[in-house]
Amino acid sequence: MCCLSFASCGKQSVAVSPDEMASRAAKIYYDYLLHGDCAAYVDGFYRPDSIPESYREQLIVSAKQYVGQMKTDHQGLVSVEAAGARTDTAKHVGEAYLMLGFGDKTKEEIVVPLVLHNGNWMLR
C-alpha cells in the first residue's frame, strides 16, 4: 500500500468532462446487458425511493426479456460503443449516445437519458 501511494504522487490527475463521464457511465450500464448482468443494469437506474424486492425482480425479468428480444431480432447484442454525450450539470441531467452492435452485423445508435445523483450518472 505504501508503494502505491508513493508511485501515484508524481502523476497529475486529468480532468474528465461531465459529458465524458456520462458517456462512460451509459456504456458501463449497457456493458452489463452485453455480459448478461441484468441485475447490475437494473441497479443503475435512479430511484429516489427504495423499491420492494419483488418489483426489482420484475425489472430484472424485463431486462432479460429485452436481451432476449435482441437475440431474436438481431442475433444478440455483441458490442457497445460510446458515441458521445450532452449534459446539463446545472439541471443534473444528460443524454449519452451509444452505438449497439448486433450479431446480424447491424448497428443501432440509441439515446440513453441520464440523471446526475450524488456525483454519479445514473439511468433515467
Identify the function of each model-found stretch.
Residues 3-4, 14-17, 39, 86-87:
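Short amphipathic alpha-helical segments, especially helix-boundary/capping motifs
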Residues 1-9:
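Sec-dependent bacterial lipoprotein signal peptides
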Residues 9-35:
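Short, low-complexity N-terminal intrinsically disordered segments enriched in polar/charged residues
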Residues 81-124:
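Exposed beta-sheet edge and beta->alpha loop/turn motif
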Residues 23-24, 28, 39-89:
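Short solvent-exposed beta->alpha transition segments
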Residues 5, 26, 94-96:
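Small side chains
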